[in-house]
Regions:
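Long, charge-dense
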Residues: 78-134, 138-141
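Phosphate-binding/switch region of NTP-binding enzymes
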Residues: 159-226, 233
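A contiguous pocket-lining binding segment that forms or flanks enzyme active sites
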Residues: 120-175
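Signal for well-folded cores of large energy- and translation-related assemblies
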Residues: 41-42, 71, 91, 119, ...
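Hydrophobic/aromatic beta-strand patches that form the interior of the parallel beta-sheet core
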Residues: 52, 78, 101-103, 153, ...
Length: 233
C-alpha cells in the first residue's frame, strides 16, 4: 500500500481496483454509519453511488465520525489531498488504518483520472480539491460513483483556503453550524468533549433539512447524540 504522503500513480490505483474492489450485492444500498447520524439520513446509512459534502468548522471531525462505522465494518477508504485530515485523529475516531490509503492531491490535469481510479477501487473516497472541478469531470465522476456504488465525500473546512463550487450539487450536504468545547476550568485543565450541531439536506429523499447535536470525546470518537430536529420518526 502507499505510505502517508506518498503520491500514487493512476496506473497503480487501477491495479488496486482489480485486487481489492469488494463485491457489492444489490441489497447493499448503503454504507453503515453510527446510530447517532441516522436521523440525518433518508436511508439507514450513506447511500452508495452518492456524493456527500461536509462543510463548516468541525467538518473533518464529522467526516471521520461518519466514516468510522463503515471503515470498521470492512470498507476501504481513500483520502486524497485533504490537509486537515490527521492520521492519528482518524484512527482515534474509529477509522481503520489498515483499510485507509492517503494520497497527495494529483496535478489538476490528472485529478479526474486519479479520482476515477480511486472510485473504482474504494468504497469511500474523501477529497478536498484546490481547483475548480470541471463540469465534464463532475459528470464523469458522478456516473462512475453511481456505477461502482462508491461514496465520494467532499470536505470543506473553514481554514481560509479558497473553495470552488462543484458544478453539480451534492446528493447529501452536511453542515456544521456550531461548535463548542468543554473541559477547561478556571484557567486550567484541557479541552475534552466537543459538541457539534450538524444539519443535513439534499436529494434522493433528503430534501427536508434535518438537524442533530452530537458530542465527540477528546479523542474525536463519537460519544453521544444529544438531540435531533426534523429527523425520522
Amino acid at each position: 500500500m502507499f505510505e502517508h504522503g506518498e503520491m500514487a500513480e493512476a496506473s497503480q490505483l487501477a491495479a488496486l481496483a482489480q485486487r481489492f474492489r469488494p463485491a457489492v450485492l444489490a441489497a447493499e444500498q448503503t454504507l453503515p454509519v453510527a446510530e447517532a447520524f441516522l436521523p440525518l439520513l433518508p436511508l439507514d446509512g450513506l447511500p452508495r453511488g452518492s456524493r456527500v459534502s461536509v462543510s463548516g468548522a468541525g467538518a473533518t471531525s464529522i467526516t471521520m465520525a461518519l466514516l468510522a462505522e463503515a471503515s470498521r465494518g470492512g470498507s476501504w477508504t481513500a483520502i486524497v489531498g485533504v490537509p486537515s485530515w490527521g492520521w492519528a485523529a482518524s484512527v482515534r475516531s474509529g477509522v481503520a488504518a489498515q483499510r485507509t490509503v492517503v494520497v497527495d492531491e494529483p496535478p489538476v490535469s490528472q485529478w479526474g483520472q486519479v479520482i476515477a481510479a480511486l472510485v473504482d477501487t474504494f468504497d469511500l473516497v474523501v477529497v478536498d480539491p484546490t481547483h475548480q472541478v470541471t463540469a465534464s469531470d463532475a459528470r464523469r465522476l458522478a456516473a462512475r460513483t453511481r456505477e461502482r456504488g462508491s461514496v465520494m465525500v467532499d470536505v470543506r473546512v473553514d481554514d481560509g483556503r479558497r473553495r470552488f463550487r462543484w458544478p453539480i450539487d451534492a446528493d447529501l450536504s452536511f453542515s456544521v453550524s456550531t461548535s463548542a468545547w468543554s473541559g477547561l476550568g478556571d484557567g486550567f485543565g484541557r479541552l475534552d468533549d466537543r459538541e457539534l450541531t450538524v444539519s443535513a439536506s439534499g436529494r434522493r429523499g433528503a430534501d427536508r433539512q434535518r438537524r442533530i447535536q452530537v458530542r465527540l470525546d477528546g479523542s474525536g470518537r463519537l460519544a453521544a447524540a444529544l438531540a435531533n430536529s426534523g429527523g425520522r420518526t
